[in-house]
């Protein structure tokens, strides 16, 4: 769940916005930008033409309906059934853990927190046992190693950094040594990734003020944190402080149940789209338009991510665990891991990347990007270093997957280029076309801002149109990048060309567009 | 080669050939249409009109055998699927053979007659295809109907579900299908398979070669359906990991199955009477005696009814012998037509049932335990998915009502093609007529949202060629 993490750019993008220029040159540049979405539109229209041809014999629509129906019958039922079989015990265990904690905390005096940690640990262990079976032992071994590494914190801040390097490095080493031999590593990888993130964050948190503030948590607290039922199987990362805060449930059960229901519904919906609907549509458009194939395939990847995210949300809600950072908590769904609506209709690539996996974004920002970039007024080189560092860490965290490396670096460059260009354009045109949404009528610094203008003014529509074009471009990039991640991440490395096939078909269009963005940016500035 | 050796071989070939022919003739008389009358169900009525009560319909009554009627009565809802399946088979057969001299024509159905006509009386390639495609279509449409829930008696076999999906996906995540079992109701293919055996194979007891051929081809059709049942899996998880894996089975479009069967038709194996004809032992090896007893080539040039056989060239063109290519998956064991072989999952209860029903079940299973020997000993024995036939096909050129052949008079042909649909081969050298006709067809169609197609009517001139 997470191919993102360059969001950090957003932080400095808004920091320095100066450089006023004349509007003359930008008109031409805008044309260029509009040209790109148009080329994408050609794909679209091409596809629709083909569709008409399909329809000509009068069976196109019927055929599509038939195929969808067919795939629904053969695919939806087993998929949903399996997902339910998977999720139901986890949800029950989360609720059980919550109940136990509640009962224990209602005693008059809380003498010790250890039983609470133990409840969490035990429930998490059962979940993992259900999920991975006897491989649990391997995970426990890794957890023990992690606890030993945690003792490094006695060295202070330096120790936390060593801990981070060792954790990420050892993860990579496991991949190298275990992955080749073990067929089941792909399953453990995600779990171990979350554990590593928790370890690193723990190290930095404890040594935040230079000295070791608190004691290193005891083994029970450590295990309870690492294997808390809400986050052990599917993530997301939560900080130790947040975990401690939520040891005792605060929300009423009724609120949780009310939030649980939509989560479960959306979860089923997402898995249906990912397993059945998107592949069926991709098949159907298989011969007509390559862009549509990419789009639907990538939709399958995206909704798979939503599915895991929403499932994790359901677990969070069930055990009343909150997330760190800016309180991205919706009333209906509880804590949000990703924001599908912002991904499906993105304002820009960087906003898309930020919404992809919010906790992961928060983690990278807090522990990697911020330390690497000490002051706000740092040089551009320093910023670049921080971005690169973030990229490197997130890649390493994801394990050895060439596809993810490629997608991440492409995303980073595309997002960076787009943000730079749009900031430049915004200041040139004095219009609200930045990568980030304008903060509102009062705070928007540009004069041409849709929230300030009336509907019938020309600039309102021009700004709208520009942003729409960037959205279309982002959708295209998303399809282009996402399609690579389709399929098991297992046979990667053997045939490098198979997963690049789509990119070849598309003529590496996205990368050229990204390059063009940079060139344009340099040209303007 | 030693001349005397050849002589001996020819002698033996004549003897065995003669005897085999006489046997074929004999069983044509006795077993004519035994298991094939049910095909007529296709013409009984529209699938939609069929209500569960209609198994009492006199038309159906006369079409189905007693056991088949019982099956239909005991499984409400199955009749519609059967009708659908039979029609599916016919249209697929006609699609696959649209460009050949024999175009899978059906006759106006009247009771007591065979739907595909007298061609079925011969044990030729075309017949083998008919049997295979009908059996496959029944399996397919029953399985489909099962998953649609229109057949009440086919329940989802929950014994197949893994205890927990999580327990599988770790192991299955890389090793793939190895130990994953599908869940839900998507294994209806098992019911389709079983039902098809009970229903389609009713009249075929496997007592003579022709019945064995029918059984084999029926089984082959089912095996093709089963083989096209694909497992599809998808991983979900963090960072491309495989934390949750969901899998399901998907039954391919029937066109795919038709294509596969057509390929097998092209590479069908001619089989012959063997000494071990009555051997029910599945493991009976290919007897060297039988194998060596007949060295006549499989293109059948020495068969007495020479007036009807293809010329050598045409035969090659029409039949494209390629058993060696198509048999690549017939590893040694698959010579044995063990019913459960293609997929052990499909008939989960075979063992149980066998135990419960004791002897009867055992006998029934023996029906499928036989070994057919290729006519040409140099060819591999037919595999479970191969089609087999007994005698060469007639040329299908001239009308011969006695044999149920319509001939190719008046068929359209393709002037430029060099293949079977070309005018040269299609018209059997009789020549063809060139006609210009004005065709009115829909054109310039536009799609209006949603969901309507509007077309203009265009008149175009077309040249058609018709066999004399």
Curated annotation (Swiss-Prot), chain B:
Positions annotated as glycosylated: 103, 108, 414
Function: Binds as a ligand to a family of frizzled seven-transmembrane receptors and acts through a cascade of genes on the nucleus. Segment polarity protein. May be a growth factor. Acts on neighboring cells to regulate at least one gene, the homeobox segmentation gene engrailed. Wg signal represses arm phosphorylation. Wg signaling operates by inactivating the sgg repression of engrailed autoactivation. Wg and Wnt2 have a role in the developing trachea and together are responsible for all dorsal trunk formation. Wg also acts in the developing epidermis.
Gene Ontology CC annotation, any one: cell surface
Signal peptide per UniProt: 1-17
Disruption of the gene: reported phenotype: Accumulation in the Golgi, thereby preventing secretion.
GO MF, one example: morphogen activity
CDD domains according to UniProt: Wnt_Wnt1
Substitution effect: residue 105 to A: Glycosylation disrupted
Effect annotated for changing residue 221 to D: In allele wg-IN67; embryonic lethal
This protein's name: Protein wingless
Pfam family, one: wnt
Region (Binds porcupine): 83-106
Quaternary assembly: Monomer; folds by intramolecular disulfide bonds. Interacts with porcupine (por). Interacts with wls; in the Golgi. Interacts with en. Interacts with the proteoglycan Cow (heparan sulfate-bound form); this stabilizes wg and promotes its extracellular distribution. Interacts with peg; the interaction facilitates short-range diffusion of wg.
Membrane topology value: Lipid-anchor
Lipid-anchored residues (O-palmitoleoyl serine): 239
Family (UniProt): Belongs to the Wnt family.
Effect ascribed to mutating residue 51 to A: No effect on glycosylation
Keywords: Developmental protein, Disulfide bond, Extracellular matrix, Glycoprotein, Lipoprotein, Membrane, Morphogen, Secreted, Segmentation polarity protein, Signal, Synapse, Wnt signaling pathway
Tissue expression remark: Segmented expression in embryos. In embryonic tracheal cells, expression is in stripes flanking the tracheal placode.
Keyword Electron transport: no
Cystine pairs: 93-104, 146-154, 156-185, 233-247, 235-242, 397-428, 413-423, 427-467, 443-458, 445-455, 450-451
């Amino acid at each position: 769940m997470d191919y993102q993490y360059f969001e950090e750019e957003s932080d400095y993008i808004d920091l320095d916005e100066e450089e006023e220029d004349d509007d003359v040159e930008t008109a031409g540049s805008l044309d260029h930008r509009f040209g790109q979405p148009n080329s994408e539109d050609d794909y679209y229209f091409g596809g629709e033409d083909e569709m008409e041809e399909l329809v000509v014999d009068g069976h196109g629509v019927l055929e599509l309906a038939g195929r969808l129906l067919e795939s629904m019958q053969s695919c939806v039922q087993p998929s949903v059934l399996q997902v339910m079989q998977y999720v139901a015990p986890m949800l029950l265990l989360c609720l059980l853990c919550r109940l136990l904690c509640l009962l224990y905390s209602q005693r008059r005096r809380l003498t010790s927190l250890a039983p609470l940690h133990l409840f969490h640990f035990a429930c998490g262990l059962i979940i993992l046992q259900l999920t991975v079976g006897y491989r649990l032992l391997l995970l426990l071994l890794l957890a023990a190693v992690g606890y030993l590494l945690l003792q490094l914190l006695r060295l202070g801040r330096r120790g936390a950094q060593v801990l981070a390097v060792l954790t990420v490095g050892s993860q990579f080493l496991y991949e190298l040594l275990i992955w080749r031999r073990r067929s089941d590593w792909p399953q453990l990888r995600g779990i171990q990734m979350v554990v590593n993130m928790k370890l690193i964050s723990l190290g930095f948190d404890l040594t935040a003020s230079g000295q070791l503030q608190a004691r290193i948590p005891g083994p029970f607290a450590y295990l309870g944190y690492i294997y808390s039922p809400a986050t052990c199987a599917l993530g997301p990362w939560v900080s130790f402080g947040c975990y401690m805060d939520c040891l005792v449930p605060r929300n009423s059960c009724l609120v949780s149940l009310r939030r649980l229901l939509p989560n479960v519904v959306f979860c089923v919906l997402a898995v249906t789209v990912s397993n059945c609907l998107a592949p069926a549509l991709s098949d159907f458009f298989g011969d007509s338009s390559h862009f549509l194939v990419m789009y639907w395939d990538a939709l399958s990847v995206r909704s798979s991510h939503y599915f895991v995210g929403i499932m994790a949300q359901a677990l969070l809600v069930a055990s009343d665990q909150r997330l760190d950072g800016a309180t991205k908590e919706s009333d209906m769904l509880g804590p949000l891991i990703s924001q599908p609506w912002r991904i499906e209709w993105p304002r820009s690539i960087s906003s898309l990347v930020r919404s992809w996996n919010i906790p992961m974004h928060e983690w990278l920002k807090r522990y990697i990007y911020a330390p690497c970039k000490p002051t706000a007024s740092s040089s551009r080189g320093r910023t670049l270093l921080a971005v690169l560092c973030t990229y490197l860490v997130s890649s390493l965290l994801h394990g050895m997957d060439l596809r993810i490396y490629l997608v991440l670096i492409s995303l980073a460059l595309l997002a960076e280029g787009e943000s730079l260009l749009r900031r430049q354009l915004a200041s040139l045109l004095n219009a609200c076309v930045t990568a980030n949404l304008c903060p509102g009528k009062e705070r928007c610094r540009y004069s041409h801002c849709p929230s300030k203008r009336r509907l019938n003014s020309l600039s309102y529509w021009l700004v709208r149109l520009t942003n729409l074009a960037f959205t279309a471009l982002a959708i295209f990039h998303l399809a282009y990048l996402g399609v690579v991640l389709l399929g098991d991440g297992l046979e990667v490395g053997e045939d490098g060309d198979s997963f690049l096939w789509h990119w070849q078909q598309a003529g590496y269009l996205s990368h050229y567009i990204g390059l063009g963005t940079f060139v344009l940016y340099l040209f303007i500035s | 080669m030693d001349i005397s050796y050849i002589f001996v071989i020819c002698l033996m070939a004549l003897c065995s050939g003669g005897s085999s022919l006489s046997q074929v003739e004999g069983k044509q008389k006795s077993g004519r249409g035994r298991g094939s009358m049910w095909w007529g169900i296709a013409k009984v009525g529209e699938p939609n009109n069929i209500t569960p009560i209609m198994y009492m319909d006199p038309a159906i009554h006369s079409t189905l055998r007693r056991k088949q009627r019982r099956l239909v009565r005991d499984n409400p809802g199955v009749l519609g699927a059967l009708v659908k399946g039979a029609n599916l088979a016919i249209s697929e057969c006609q699609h696959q053979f649209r460009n050949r001299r024999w175009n899978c024509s059906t006759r106006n159905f009247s009771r007591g007659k065979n739907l595909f006509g007298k061609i079925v009386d011969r044990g030729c390639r075309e017949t083998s295809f008919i049997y295979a495609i009908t059996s496959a279509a029944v399996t397919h449409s029953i399985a489909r109907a099962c998953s649609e829930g229109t057949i009440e008696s086919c329940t989802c076999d929950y014994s197949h579900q893994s205890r927990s999906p999580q327990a599988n996906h770790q192991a299955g995540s890389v090793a793939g299908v190895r130990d994953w079992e599908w869940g839900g109701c998507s294994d209806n293919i098992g019911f389709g398979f079983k039902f098809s055996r009970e229903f389609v194979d009713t009249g075929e007891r496997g007592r003579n070669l022709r019945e064995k051929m029918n059984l084999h081809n029926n089984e082959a059709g089912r095996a093709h359906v089963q083989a096209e049942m694909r497992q599809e899996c998808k991983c979900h998880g963090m960072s491309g990991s495989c934390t949750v894996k969901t899998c399901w089975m998907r039954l391919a479009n029937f066109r795919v199955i038709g294509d596969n069967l057509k390929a097998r038709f092209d590479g069908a194996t001619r089989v012959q009477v063997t000494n071990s004809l009555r051997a029910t032992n599945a493991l009976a090896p290919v007897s060297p005696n039988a194998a060596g007893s007949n060295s006549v080539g499989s293109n059948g040039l020495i068969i007495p009814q020479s007036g009807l056989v293809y010329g050598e060239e045409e035969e090659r063109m029409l039949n494209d012998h390629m058993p060696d290519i198509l048999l690549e998956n017939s590893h040694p064991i698959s010579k044995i037509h063990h019913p459960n072989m293609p997929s052990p999952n499909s008939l989960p209860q075979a063992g149980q049932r066998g135990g419960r029903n004791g002897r009867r079940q055992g006998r029934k299973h023996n029906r499928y335990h036989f070994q057919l020997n290729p006519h040409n000993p140099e060819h591999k024995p037919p595999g479970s998915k191969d089609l087999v036939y007994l005698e060469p096909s007639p040329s299908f050129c001239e009308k011969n009502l006695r044999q149920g052949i319509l001939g190719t008079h008046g068929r359209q042909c393709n002037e430029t093609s060099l293949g079977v649909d070309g005018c040269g081969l299609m018209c059997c050298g009789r020549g063809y007529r060139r006609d210009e006709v004005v065709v009115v067809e829909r054109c310039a169609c536009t799609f209006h949202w949603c969901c309507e197609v509007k077309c203009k009517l265009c008149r175009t001139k077309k040249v058609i060629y018709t066999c004399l």
